[in-house]
Structure formats: C-alpha cells, structure tokens
C-alpha cells in the first residue's frame, strides 16, 4: 500500500492509502506502486488516477519516498 497526499493551492484534495497512482509525467504517463524507487518528477497536463478516481490537472510535481507519495498540483478548472 501507498500513503497518498494530493495538495492544490486551495486545499488538500486527497489523503489516504491506495494501491497505485498513475500520473502524467514529462515523458508520458507512469504508475507508482508499493516499494517504488525514490523519485521527484515534474507533472504535465493530464489526469491523476488513484483509488478509482480521476483528477484532471494542469501540472505540478510528485515525490515518492518509502511508500509515501506526495503530489502538489494545479487543478484544471471546468
């Protein structure tokens, strides 16, 4: 399991445990699973997928460390 926290400038969008997270990276979408290597990556416009949810974003960054995933994102407005 992963501990996921998604933060936007307005609020904490999600905080909880998930089995995986898919994010839009600079070189394409990638999936983060348990025991993923530590990483910091820029996110591009796309969709973050987690626990059956989809969150459209304009960009941001992701940090993975010891099964903790932190996303700081700018949300896409409807």
List PLM regions with ranges.
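Compact, glycine-rich, soluble single-domain proteins
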Residues: 2-78
């Amino acid at each position: 399991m992963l501990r996921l926290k998604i933060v936007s400038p307005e609020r904490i969008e999600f905080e909880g445990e998930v089995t995986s997270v898919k994010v839009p990276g600079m070189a394409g979408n990638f999936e983060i699973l348990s025991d993923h290597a530590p990483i910091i990556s820029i996110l591009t416009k796309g969709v973050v997928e987690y626990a059956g949810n989809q969150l459209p974003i304009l960009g941001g960054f992701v940090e993975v460390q010891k099964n903790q995933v932190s996303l700081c994102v700018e949300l896409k407005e409807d």
